[in-house]
Amino acid sequence: TDRPAQFSDSSRKAYHQHLATFRGLDNLITVAPNDVEGLRAAFAQAEEHGWFSEATFLEPVMGEGNPGMGTTPAFYAAARELTRAHGALLLIDSIQAGLRAHGVLSIIDYPGFEGLDAPDMETYSKALNAGQFPLSVLALSTRAAELYRKGLYGNTMTANPRAMEVAVAVLEQVTPAMRRNIVERGREFLQRLEK
């Protein structure tokens, strides 16, 4: 339609409510998105206190916390550099962003991220399963794969053949034309929101 999109920020209260359990903990350090100096300061603070940073988590295009805000190449590059230097893992949560933001699955395939090193782990789901089937995918770097304990990981959400068929069908539909369409529709949507 020609009508502008209506949207609500009703999820923000619930988002912050559930994060409240992490406030005040000294073993969780948060950094504002794309604040490279803040990220460097967080790693320096951890080192100063003798804390080992197990992992850094990033969402390439935010969903619930600040919908649509994207991680910059400079911030990602700093995170990759710092995690590697401090022996921490870099985990990218592409559950919502994969395919839907830039027409590609991985953050390292986003425009401006070409040539940057891959994260240690990256998760995908909703774009692969049409948001309908219980399917999540975990991509691992060689380093992370070597740390991952081998064994049987079974639960309700694993090894769903139909969900795998859905993911294969989705990936078979991803053509250069579809990727361009995703990017063009995204730009169009942003222009309409800005009016």
Kindly label every feature range from the protein language model.
Residues 1-54, 74, 187:
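PLP-dependent aspartate aminotransferase-fold enzymes
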Residues 4-15, 73-78, 105-119, 140-146:
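A glycine- and small-aliphatic-rich helix-loop capping segment at beta-alpha/alpha-beta transitions
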Residues 59-73, 88-113:
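Conserved PLP phosphate-binding loop immediately N-terminal to the Schiff-base lysine helix
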Residues 82-86:
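Helix C-cap/helix->beta junction micro-motif
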Residues 112-147, 159-164:
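Active-site PLP attachment segment
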Residues 168-173:
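Short glycine/serine- and small hydrophobic-enriched flexible loop segments
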Residues 176-195:
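Conserved PLP-dependent catalytic core of the aminotransferase class-I/II
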